[in-house]
Amino acid sequence: MLFCITANYTPKALEAMGKNPKTNRREAVEKLVTAGGGKLVAMYGTIAEGPGAMVIFEADPAVAPAIAAVAASSDGVSNVKMQRLLSGDEVRAIRQKRVELQKSYSPPSK
């Protein structure tokens, strides 16, 4: 399954990267993801909510939250969020299941 983690760099991390602008965080991220049996798919820098990173990785759904927790526990990032990414086929299957389930539900007001 695919997951996406987004996070903002802390002032401490930005200061460290300013002192060593050639630093490569991808290697550290890849090591963490592969230690959990996953695969790093992509890593991007982000600027929308301040300097940060977006990591897309493949992992077992029981392990992905642990990977996010390790990242969140570092003092280099804040505002860590993880999402499960769904393919178009998965979204269509969810919509179909919703239609089936809707037939068996009636809101309390009815």
Residue ranges, per PLM feature:
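Short S/T/G/P-rich N-terminal loop/turn motif that feeds into the first structured element of a domain
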Residues: M1-T34, K39-V41, T46-G50, A62-P65, ...
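A structural signal for short, well-ordered beta-strand segments
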Residues: I5-A7, V55, M82
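Short connector loops at helix/strand junctions that flank enzyme active sites
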Residues: E49-G52, V77
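An amphipathic, aromatic/His-enriched active-site/gating alpha helix that lines ligand/cofactor pockets
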Residues: E58-D89
